[in-house]
Amino acid sequence: THSDLPMTIAFDGRMWMMGGWYNGRLPGHSASNQVWCSTDGANWRQAMPNAEWSPRLASALVEFQGKMWLLGGTENYYFGDASSVKNDVWCSGDGVHWECVTNSAGWAPRAYHQAAVLDGKLYVFGGGNYVPDYVALNDVWVSEDGREWTCLTDAAPWHPRLWFSAAVYRDRMWVLGGWSNNPSTNWADVWYSKDGKTWTQLKSNLIWRERHEHSVFVYEDKLWVAGGMIPPLNNEVWSL
């Protein structure tokens, strides 16, 4: 039921879904720390009713060093404050037993961000907070162990943003689309980097329309963009 901004990943032959928000701004809203998995997408098993990390949504979730790594997020979508946003780092090899690698990583607390793994290193970039105070970031951080972090840049050339998507494709990290405020703006730009410091914009005469909260994935050596909020909600599928 906590299907708004949960964390998802394919890991160890299973699809995983964890955390997320329920019921929007309506009574009974809540965040989750449930962990679910499935081998076929139709039949789901609850691996954990309450993981060790606090209920949250909009964390980053990646595979690193043979484990799932969960980074940051927010404990409250619409009704929180600055303390709701997290910068803790957790890892698990089975979705059941979670280890807190650090309660306070070097990067500022954030949600709606992304993480990536490239050349044996773990990267965190962008994101921030939506309400009550809008914060958007375009910094890039790197770690070799998830505990000690180094800032590669305080300001990447792409605009600070929330609700963007990222992937690792052809030995590069990619940042695609997203949203920023003041004024409210959806993005349709595409950036890539091999090291997190130097970013290059990929420009194309034919590209998908500006959007946020879209899906990005790699399949058959192509980079795919699916869905997203333009508005309205969209069901286009594009590939590069």
Give the predicted meaning of each segment.
Residues 1-240:
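Kelch-like beta-propeller repeat domains
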